[in-house]
Amino acid sequence: MTVDPPWALLAELTHACPLRCGYCSNPIELVSRSAELTGEQWADVFDQAAGLGVVQTHLSGGEPLLRRDLPQIVRAADTAGLYTQLVTSGVGLTEPRLATLVAGGLRSVQLSVQHTRPDASERIAGARSFAAKERAARLIRTAGLPFGLNAVLHRANIDAVDELIDLALAWGADRIELANTQFHGWALRNRTALLPSHDQIARARAVVARRRELLGKLLELVWVAPDHVDGTAKPCMGGWGAVSLTVAPDGTVLPCPAAASLPGLDPPNVRAHRLDWIWWHSPAFTAYRGESWMRDPCRGCALRGVDHGGCRCQAYALTGDATRTDPACRLAPDHALVRNLVDRAAKPRGDLTHVHRAYREEGP
């Protein structure tokens, strides 16, 4: 099969975070601060990524602003020729800090938002943060950077989609991504409390369609579909090892952010291998690349080139076998597993609350 070079790099600079969101998709076992790559090592990663064909990097976490050397990291990515986007909660962003990052080559910012009401936002995030987000939005807009909001949708905020769109307009965002929760990592522990009902999703989808028509090009609305409810498997990262790669805080390189959950994958690390070998030859990246690994019904399905068999991590989480068809797909032999979850979400369940993300005291 023909394999193209990657064009995007998700750089997870740290797992440390001031928020404790119950929908966090980072792994249960987080990388400690002492095990993180140094700024110099990140600079080498960016140089290798650019040489491989990568053109943009998302500087993420955790909260990347907790890295004191973030200005040096941004400058290194820019020097390597990569387009840089900061993915942040906004907590800790100040005018001088943002000015330093922009001077170093920061090109755009994505700011997370949990709700439009401060009390609801902070209940979801598990920390006081709404005022910091509002202040960060103002700073980003004043700096003239391309500015997007990201709202992870779940049972506690999906009914506020209309208000979230209004918030994006009020804060001056160019784009808002309304991303239904991906049930990986900590979010998987909270799936029962987080999963919205079919009716909630239908209402939210209708709101997005209506607002798209009304707003036109004034605000880009991105709706990340809820595969559990739609019956359509999500195309895993555009295909396993097809368009992007993730480097975790300790240098582990993954085809997708959740892939470390798969048993036997043995993901490589930039401390031991170069990115070009990792991309082209490592067993972790070739494991589910293409179609040769597929079993029926995926192997003979007309959608196999569209959804790539769905999410390997979700297939493993739900069935215990990463090679099975993603149960989110309505054609999957295990689709009843997902239907049962969705049907349960539609029943009155009282005031279920999610468990906030927990961190070890000696580090994240």
Predicted feature descriptions by range:
Residues E29, G62, Q114, T181, ...:
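Flexible loop residues that form catalytic
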Residues V45-G61, D326-P364:
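Short Fe-S-cluster ligation motifs
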Residues E36-E40, A127-A131, S292:
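Conserved phosphate-coordination/catalytic loops
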